[in-house]
Design a protein with these regions (language model features):
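Residue-level hotspots at or immediately adjacent to binding/recognition sites across diverse folds
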Residues: 2-7, 11, 17-453
Length: 453
């Protein structure tokens, strides 16, 4: 179901959104001091007009959501959602047909990628759209697009943006590497011919700052940068480091303020280029410098979500019952972690989003009302108020839609579900045995084609 109002975003519209958010931020800062009942309602964000697929990738402290949606011709557009409205960022002046929005900060700056209108001379698939066009990273705010420079190669992409406007991502160099997969490999990567490096585009700057890989590694990718300027991601060899959407590397890495890499360790395994998505990668870091991600277990057949701190090192978070793989994709400043737990192969298995809090991993579906129309599939982001952004399957339309899950006790007005008589997984086990839902094969193929971050 599309939202009631959908339009191309304008400067005036976004300024109005930001003005409306001022009081919301003040209210939520006061409300965030109070403990809430950990149960949620879920808001289906819908799609852009004519679209059948959308996903949310980031969420601010006042509920502004960034992501991507298909449109009527089947192409993908970077999008924003706020208070019942959908805004089409499109492919902002970059010439291509497809784009996506990933990270978003409190100033409504969006980090994204767009196809250009130029064919990649190596016919690589860096953006993941399968068109063979060059992939261009950008920073966008209030209708203005900043094209981000590369490292001498043809392609780059981004993953996140902090509140200082620093963008984390990856950019190709001009160096050919015979270790790169020259054809589409079993792990879903390729064809890739050039090395790529983790980079940061500092706020207001177009030129990237290279983040060197660990000694012995040749490539890297930066997935998150916090407000302290610390970045996390992965490094490895071009043969065992997988680009998004199923990113993994030989080593999960933290880069300090000087750009020096630090190995975060592993849970017993290393990268496995023979199995999609299996390896080590740090996906996010909060402002306490605590890191979440996924690490290969001994035997290199499965990944498990982890939380890393300087004091504890890498600690496994587990998987949901019956699942074989998991990954922590985001962490807020309260160390609440969201991500995905998967039954089967990372690419083809059934995904189940989770919320991990105080040592307990809960299926997100058990925290929602039983009559929720959208079945959540993956949780990509969480803000400090506990609002969770992701995407789910809508059985009535057979479509996949972005969602925002809102916790009880904050701005949630669902008095019946949020009353003390109904508790979810973290209280009484209301709905805890709700069956997991397998996706139709057609939608599974769509997810494989579009990928996710």
């Amino acid at each position: 179901m599309n939202l009631a109002s959908s339009n191309t975003i304008s400067g005036a519209a976004l300024l109005a959104v930001l003005a409306m958010s001022t009081n919301i931020v003040a209210q939520q800062q006061e409300q965030s001091k109070q403990e809430h009942t950990l149960r949620y309602t879920l808001r289906d964000l819908g799609t852009l007009p004519g679209g059948t697929f959308s996903q949310a990738a980031g969420v601010t402290g006042y509920g502004l959501v960034s992501g991507v949606s298909t449109v009527s011709d089947g192409t993908q557009h970077a999008a924003l959602w706020f208070e019942g409205r959908t805004f089409d960022i499109g492919t902002p002046g970059l010439g291509g047909a497809n784009s996506a929005g990933f990270g978003i900060n409190m100033w409504a700056e969006v980090a994204g990628q767009s196809e250009s209108n130029t064919t990649d001379p190596n016919n690589e698939n860096f953006c993941g759209y399968g068109t063979g066009m060059k992939c261009q990273p950008f920073r966008w705010q209030n209708g203005k697009t900043t094209r981000l420079s590369l490292l001498g190669g043809n392609n780059g992409t981004v993953s996140n943006i902090n509140n200082r406007g620093d963008v984390s991502g990856v950019a190709e160099t001009g160096k050919r590497d015979p270790a790169c997969p020259g054809a589409v490999a079993v792990n879903g990567t390729g064809p890739q011919f050039l090395d790529f490096e983790a980079v940061i585009w500092n706020g207001g700057q177009k030129a990237p700052r290279e983040l060197r890989p660990l000694a012995g590694d040749t490539v890297g990718e930066a997935y998150w940068i916090n407000d302290n300027g610390l970045a996390v991601g992965a490094t490895g060899l071009c043969s065992n480091t997988q680009l998004p959407p199923f990113a993994a590397g030989a080593h999960a890495v933290l880069w300090d303020n000087y750009g020096s890499p630090h190995d975060l360790g592993n849970l017993g395994g290393t990268a496995n280029p023979a199995i999609r998505g299996i390896g080590n990668i740090a996906f996010a870091i909060n402002n306490r410098n605590h890191v979440v991600g996924a690490s290969a277990l001994a035997g290199n057949a499965n990944d498990e979500a982890f939380l890393w701190t300087k004091e504890t090192g890498m600690v496994p978070l587990g998987r949901l019952d019956g699942d074989t793989n998991s990954a922590g994709l985001a962490v807020n400043n309260k160390d609440e972690v969201v991500g995905g737990s998967i039954n089967g192969d990372i690419l083809t298995g059934d995904p189940h989003p989770f919320l991990w809090r105080n040592g307990v991993m809960a299926p997100l579906s058990t925290l929602l009302p039983p009559d929720t129309d959208l079945i959540p599939l993956l949780a990509n982001a969480i803000n400090d108020d506990g609002e969770i952004a992701g995407f789910g399957f809508q059985p009535s339309s057979q479509e996949i839609h972005a969602f925002l899950a809102i916790p009880c006790g904050r701005t949630n007005t669902d008095k019946q579900w949020c009353s003390e008589d109904h508790r979810g997984f973290f209280g009484r086990s209301d709905g805890a045995d709700r069956p997991k839902t397998a996706l139709p094969e057609s939608l599974r193929r769509l997810l494989q084609q579009l990928g996710h971050r």
